[in-house]
Amino acid sequence: TKTGNFKPKNGEACGSERMDVTADCFHAKGDNWHWFEKTELGLNQIIFKHDTMITFSRGLDGFFVFENSKSDSNCLLGDIDGNTSRRSDQQLPTVAEADYLEFMSVEENNHRFLLEGNVSVEGNNLYLTCDKIELLFVKDVNGSSRQIGKINTMEAIGNVMLRQGGRKSYANEMTLSVPEGVAELRGSPDGKTLARVVDEEWGEAVGEKIILVKGKRMAKVVGGKSGRPRVVLPPIPNLGFDKISGQKKSKP
């Protein structure tokens, strides 16, 4: 940043102009920033209150890529090296934007990133929008002290829309567990809004909870108080049978 108000004794600093932060695994920038050395929740808290963007260089490691399919990356090509985008053995970055961004060190080896307001996340075969999202990174105990680790969980809340190649998912909330390899979509607590997955191949699934499995083009639909789960299959093609079985055509 070009200017800022620094208070070393209080362990804080702030500024209204744009600030860039570069770490081992991410690059963040935004306006109207505030830094705290220590808070009740963690250490080295940085807040951007306007026009924020953060790029995670290691991304989600292809979590949303279907098996036996080509990568349909929605990454911003300007943020990655051209050769990297062509190599399947390289991870593509995950880029997130929001009105508000906050990140800090929490507990030991963990880092939390919170984004709120007009949130969008783009990555390898992934485009996600929602009102609020929280990312938790967990570092390997044997890793470098500078590293923030890898994405462990992702919690998206409010008007969640997840777009992948040939599939769109909608929910009130979504919880992604990278270690377990599953994403859980949930409807609203009052049951008025259900989770929904629309797939070009097998149709539409609706339920109180839908579970997506890493690398698989499948969904497990769970019903609840709002009713039984529902699956709408694509139209069945004409199989060639006559409308009236056994009816013979009359000769002219």
Which residues does each PLM region occupy?
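Mature-chain termini and adjacent capping regions
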Residues: 1-252
